[in-house]
């Protein structure tokens, strides 16, 4: 089923300028296409035009044409569009309508008044395709992130749609679960011949399996329409703020000139032999031993255990420490207990057993308010933290709650606005800011209180590479210049690799490892236990025959830090 955009332009009624500008794009029947681009580039708007949300549910002005199999979508209604294009959303919870997996998959069939006997057969067959046939009676809300996504996928597949649209399917998934999701999408594409369109930031993870083309968007326009090899060999990813595969970054760091003929889009097809001398030379010239860490303790966690239901431990006898001035990550798959550690540190939860000390004092003796004087936390979604209309008032709120006089409040807020690059926005309403700017406001709101420890929960969620790099470089400067200790909670292995010195790995409720990042990332068996995966940096070093892969990873980390 062919998709044809011809001189297609779309403008939301609420905006002055078009979000999509003069789009000309053809996607053939059975193609597998990836759409990439920075936040605000128009990727999701393009997807909403395909599935009929625009213009039937989301209003705006359209010009040009969009035809699916020769039919102009203006002649269709929303119901007809959804019978052609099945959409799997980033937030799968918002897509569930059934009390069980089976009911959710059957929802579309019930609307079509399919007889019950046929319905059972179709549901079972569809569930088997996405490996859910053994949990049809389970509530979808009790499943893991990867399982939830498969339920959503099955729910659109029973309609027997011709086009499958995935809107950021990897956004909330840990690396191993993300790879499994890409495997299933690839399996469906090969077995059914359906047209597959994937909108995603995490390009290297999507390229875990082959795709036909990559469409790159910027400011509402298509700036590239290429094969994966053509795009990866170009400099367009870097120019437009899209993270390129790690092994490509490492090859470029070593001065390697990559061409389309090298088949660079997939590590398995890349011609590595020609690059081996340059890689080895770069590695031997670049290696510098790690500097010893500051040994003065800030936070000590001793034998911490916690259970939400009193039966199964979410955390089981976990111990670790964080030194003053460190930049540390807690790494683990979804549901491993990472966020529970944060809640215990902040005092929102009380441990069943164990203790937490800060600067030698037992935090069990401190209230949540007293802990907040020393520890600041920035939540994944800035909208969950913001409580005031104006930027100045939001940042000043914590100081005012402490009874600080207004002259001091004003001085401190102005200082922090300057530090965070927000001074020119001080009189702006928060609603006028971008997502990344809101994130800076939440960090500023915490920093003005002068915490000793700053905790960032999934700081890169919902942000493209360009915007999250800006934010993380700012956080790195806070760590270097002000000496603020930083703790990141994440399953984003690229983030952990680029910015943190040490990783604490949690798996199956227990502490699995506590070591420098380059050591953690050079141990495949350990990563497998944590439901994580080796990075392509490891694969590159291994393919090159480098014995000390941890040192190779350390070289790359140092190179990236110097060139940010």
Swiss-Prot record:
Keyword rRNA processing in record: no
Residue span(s) of domain ABC transporter: 3-244, 299-533
CDD domains according to UniProt: ABC_cobalt_CbiO_domain1 (cd03225)
Chain residues that bind ATP 2: 332-339
EC number(s) from the headed UniProt entry: 7.-.-.-
Keywords linked to the UniProt accession: ATP-binding, Cell inner membrane, Cell membrane, Membrane, Nucleotide-binding, Repeat, Translocase, Transport
Role noted for this protein: Probably part of an ABC transporter complex. Responsible for energy coupling to the transport system.
Protein name (record): Putative ABC transporter ATP-binding protein PBPRA2240
Annotated organism of origin: Photobacterium profundum (strain SS9)
């Amino acid at each position: 089923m062919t998709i044809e955009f011809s001189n297609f332009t779309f403008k939301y009624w609420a905006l002055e300028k078009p979000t999509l500008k003069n789009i000309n794009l053809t996607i053939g029947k059975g193609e597998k296409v990836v759409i990439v681009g920075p936040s605000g580039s128009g990727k999701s708007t393009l997807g909403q035009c395909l599935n009929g949300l625009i213009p039937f549910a989301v209003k705006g002005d359209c010009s040009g044409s969009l035809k699916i199999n020769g039919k102009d979508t203006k002649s269709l209604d929303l119901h007809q569009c959804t019978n052609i294009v099945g959409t799997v959303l980033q937030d799968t919870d918002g897509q569930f309508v059934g009390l069980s997996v089976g009911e959710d998959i059957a929802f579309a069939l019930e609307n079509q008044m399919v007889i019950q006997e046929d319905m059972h057969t179709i549901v079972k067959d569809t569930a088997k395709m996405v490996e859910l046939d053994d949990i049809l009676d389970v509530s979808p809300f009790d499943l893991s992130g990867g399982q939830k996504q498969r339920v959503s996928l099955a729910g659109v597949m029973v309609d027997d749609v011709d086009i499958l649209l995935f809107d950021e399917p990897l956004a909330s998934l840990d690396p191993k679960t993300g790879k499994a999701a890409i495997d299933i999408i690839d399996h469906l594409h090969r077995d059914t011949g359906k047209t597959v369109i994937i909108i995603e930031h995490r390009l290297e993870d999507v390229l875990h399996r082959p795709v036909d083309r990559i469409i790159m968007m910027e400011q509402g326009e298509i700036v590239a329409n290429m094969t994966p090899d053509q795009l990866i060999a170009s400099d367009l990813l870097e120019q437009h703020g899209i993270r390129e595969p790690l092994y490509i970054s490492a090859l470029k760091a070593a001065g390697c000139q990559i061409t389309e003929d090298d088949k660079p889009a997939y590590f398995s097809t890349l011609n590595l032999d020609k690059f081996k001398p340059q890689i080895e030379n770069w590695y031997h010239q670049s290696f510098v031993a790690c500097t010893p860490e500051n040994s003065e303790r800030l936070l000590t966690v001793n034998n911490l255990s916690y259970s939400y239901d009193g039966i199964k431990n979410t955390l089981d006898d976990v111990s670790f420490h964080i030194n003053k001035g460190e930049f540390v990550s807690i790494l683990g798959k979804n549901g491993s207990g990472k966020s529970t550690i944060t809640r215990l540190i902040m005092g929102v939860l009380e441990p069943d057993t164990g203790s937490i000390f800060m600067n030698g004092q037992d935090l069990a003796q401190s209230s949540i308010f007293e802990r907040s004087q020393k520890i600041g936390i920035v939540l994944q979604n800035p909208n969950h933290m913001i409580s005031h209309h104006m930027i100045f008032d939001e940042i000043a709120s914590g100081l005012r709650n402490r009874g600080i006089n207004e002259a001091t409040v004003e001085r401190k807020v102005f200082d922090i606005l300057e530090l965070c690059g927000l001074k020119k926005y001080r009189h702006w309403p928060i609603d006028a800011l971008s997502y990344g700017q809101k994130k800076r406001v939440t960090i500023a709101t915490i920093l003005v209180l002068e915490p000793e420890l700053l905790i960032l929960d999934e700081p890169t969620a919902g942000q493209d590479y360009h915007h999250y790099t800006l934010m993380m470089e700012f956080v790195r400067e806070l760590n270097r210049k002000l000496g603020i200790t930083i703790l990141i909670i994440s399953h984003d292995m690229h983030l952990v690799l680029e910015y943190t010195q040490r990783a604490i790995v949690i798996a199956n409720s227990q502490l699995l490892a506590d070591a420098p990042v380059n050591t953690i990332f050079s141990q495949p068996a350990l990563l497998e236990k944590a439901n994580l995966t080796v990075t392509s940096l490891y694969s590159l070093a291994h393919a090159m025959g480098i014995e000390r892969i941890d040192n190779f990873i350390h070289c790359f980390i140092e190179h990236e830090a110097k060139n940010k």
